[in-house]
Every structure is written in C-alpha cells, then in structure tokens.
C-alpha cells in the first residue's frame, strides 16, 4: 500500500485543482458541443451578449446596459440572486427586467427613469474593468455600484417599474408624449429588447420617448405633479370636477398606479385627461382651460388673496413653492358662484349672464371684449393669441403678465371684486341679470341712456331701477 506523504498529498491536490479548472474552462468556453442537452440553457446564456458590449451575459453585471445592475433588476423572488432562475418581468412582455431596456413598457427607457432629470448622465460607452457596467455608473472601476433607481412619488416603486411615476393618475406613457403626437404602444417588439417598436426609430436603436416638459421647469411631465405650473395639481385638472376622485393610496397590483384609476387591478388604464375647451391642450397642460382669456392660475385663486408663482421648487416635484401648502397640496380652485364648475372651468364665474371672456377683457366698459378669441395659439401654451398681448410667442408665463388681478383686470365700481366675479358690476344696487331690460338673456345689449355704455356697467343709467318681472314693483324695492 502506497504511503501518503505531504509531498504526494500536495501533488494530488494540485492535480485535482487542475482537473476542476479544465472542466470549468471547457464548460464556459465558446465550444459547448459536448455539454449534455439538459444543460443547454447554459450554452445559450453564456454565448449571449444582449447589449452587444463584447461581454457575455454570463459575466456581465448589467446585461441590458441601462446602468441598473442585474441583481437590482431581478427582484429575486426565489432568493438565489440569479436572474436566470425565475426572472422578474414587470411588464410581462416576455423580456426579463435585467434584459429589458423599458421594464415598465411606458416608452421611457430605464436608463432615463432610473436617474434624476437634472442629474442625468448618459452612458460613456467605456467599461474599463470589463464587468459590463458602464464606467459612468461606477465610482471606480470594479466597484460595481450601478445606478440607484429613484422613486419620484415615494410609493416604494422606482420610476423604471412605475407606470405612474408622479402618482397623478395619468400614465407616464401619456405624459411623456405630446398630446397631438401621442402614440399608444403597438404591442410589437421586433428586436426583443423590451422596448415597443413605436418608440424606436429602427429595431435595436433603443431610443425611447424623449419626455415632454410642458412648463419648462425642472421636471418632465411624467415626474411633474403640476405640468402646466398653474398651481392646480394634474390629478385635479385631469378629472371632471363633479366626479373628482383623489388617490386612495392603495395599489393592489403593485404597478405604481393608484387603484382609483384602474377598473380592475392590473388593467392599468389610468385617467383619461379632460380637455374642457377642446383645443390641442388637455387641461393639465393648458394655462387657460376654458378659453376665456383668463389664466387658470388667476381663476384658481381669490382676487384679494392672489399669490404669484415664486419660480422655486425646492422639493423638485414640479409644484411651485408658493402652492405647496402641506404635503404638495396645490391650489384648491375657487368657485365664486358655488353652483357649477370651479372658476377656471366656468365660462360665467359670477352667473350674471355676461361671459368671463367679456367681463375679463372689457377695459373700456362698452360691453364688448377688447381682446377677442382668434383660434390660434402660437406658443402652444393653451392661451389663445387674442389674449397674449404683443408677444405671441413669449416665454412660458402661467399668469400671462397679470401680477395683481385686483388692479390688472376690469373693475367698474372698484368695490367688492373684479367684474368677472361681481354680480353687480357697476355697484348701483341692481344685479347684472336684473339690468337685462329687454329680457333676452344678454345684458350687454341694453343701453337705456344710449350713451354707449350698457346699463349693467352704467350706474347713471336713466333706467337704473327697472321692473324686470312686470309686477309693478321696482327691482330695488
């Protein structure tokens, strides 16, 4: 019997190590002809280079080159930290998250959604340590850090896995696109990269949507809770006032969309933003939602309590500091007459039979608006050119040069409120509807004195105390 000496034991160990190494080299080399069929999945995975960076997926820590390392993108439901087994596929498109450049199928690529808007860093195309992670997403070569995906609405779902990143009920896919140029996903993915064909110029280009930023602030609309910067939350403007539903705070299916905005968990409809004036801009992107020439930012607030936008947004949620209130509250839209729509959606705010379009734009008090609707909106902000002033393509101004509505808007009697909110414009004690002498429902054509000023704007009219109901008793009695 051969005696084992320390030298012989060392030699046998070395031989064993050599054999194991040889086997591993054989298995992970480019030739897999001798691998049994049951291990064929290893052949495919080891040969595949999803992002074409020259590093096989088997040793690439970021297979889809989105900057988010695979161990983050695989939610690891089986606990083995291996994206090959039971891989996570958030959007159920057949492409696992770690191979999917658009994991939530909203058209915005994960590399964009994982980063802050103003701190965005594009891939450098350099990978010094050959681990598959772009150098721009490692502090030092080999550190393997990768992006730490942001969660804009703090709902525990990072934006790249959240179909409603700002929690306003409007899908990111809708907010990332212009209204006129909107394209829904086609459901085709020719190159199998997880990005819908509608959002690639050509298969494999991986372009994705370039998210729209309506108000030009620090956040694109899909991360902006007030996309037009009028102080009214998108969640409010996207819905009818009468049927408004706030978020319930529940998300049964974990897709990032509040349950109030899905018919059933997983259906993912979201809100269909309303467009009150049927112009090219839905209300949440329209600074004048009902086309009366008065900006929503003005009409959403009281005249005496009007607060200008500050131009600051410390928490980077898209809502101006002036309207934050407590917990991103935004403005609570004013409703002067208390009977129908809030003022920013009400074409006759004071219910006096004279439209706001007239009362808010009649500076010479002749019953005819000095600025009239043209049907053209050169700067596409939702405010018609007729009300823009001299510069039709001015920088984005949510209040359109109105700094103090109490002095900047028509107010015939100088008391109570400006005309579009004053039931008695001339302060003669007769409500404007009662000065409709001919009873045709239009006080603007009643000029009893013939002086060119309609009675409702003329406190000195000779018929300042009519009997509009014909009962023999003057209206003022």
What are these regions (language model features)?
Residues 41-477:
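Extracellular calcium-associated, cysteine-rich motifs in secreted modular proteins
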Residues 1-46:
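Sec-dependent, cleavable N-terminal signal peptides
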